[in-house]
Amino acid sequence: MKILIILSIILCSLFGRADLEYVDNDIYTYNGGRNENGCLEVYDPYEKFNRKVFAFNSVLDYIIFRPLAVGYKNITNDYIKARVNSFISNVYTPLTVVNYGLQLNYDKTMKSVWRFLINTTLGIGGLFDVASKVGLQSDRQTFGSTLAHYGVAPGPYLVLPIIGSTNARDMTDSVITNYAINPLMYYTHNDFDLWILAVSKITDRYIVLPFSDYVMKNSTDPYVAIRSALHRAREASVQYPENFKCPKPKN
């Protein structure tokens, strides 16, 4: 059973969550404000290698993981999906607390602490997002977000076998860092951690189903479309230091 869970986790990473929003006329936009001082241009010096890995990952996704996401979509109603999303978000709130702390952002650190406590208790283990109703919203932070806070640019775009799309700055997030520095993971059973990770990846893949399906069917170059969407969505989600300028790629 553990092997199946771990396999699901790995396969779920083939398409990263891009926080994309479907709008009319088959056009996709990016959630979140535009980060004017971010690195809006993708740096892809390893494109030849990345394309080969992208093709490999796409086959695995089509055969194995996309069907899992479609199954999740079909067997759960909107109410269940909302409870799952709220629960998963709450589980990762301690990670946000740690990263806001590393960013020396006291206000958002304390808001995230209170958000976790309220949703864990009054929200029945995080199944309901009670904290947002009292003004305690919190943007999910990763170690990559913290590095960006201190002026670390995304670096080269990478597509890794099985793991999927990332960049030099964020590549440890989905593999090691997010779980190594999440305090909750040290106080829960390993089986629980694996299930949480698997479910979160399944929901992430479900969220991008409309976008990935549209791109794979209609785009003349799915690699470029997905690369651009993931990169811009990620850049819109991080906050660089004031007056930060993205370094120009070396030729």
Curated annotation (Swiss-Prot):
- Signal peptide limits: 1-18
Which domain of life does the UniProt lineage start with? Bacteria
Recorded coiled-coil stretches: none
GO biological process assignments = intermembrane phospholipid transfer
Which UniProt key words apply to this protein? Signal
Please tell me one Gene Ontology term that the record gives under cellular component.
membrane
Q: Record's family?
A: Belongs to the MlaA family.
Q: What is this protein called?
A: Uncharacterized protein RP093
Q: What is the lineage of its organism?
A: Bacteria, Pseudomonadati, Pseudomonadota, Alphaproteobacteria, Rickettsiales
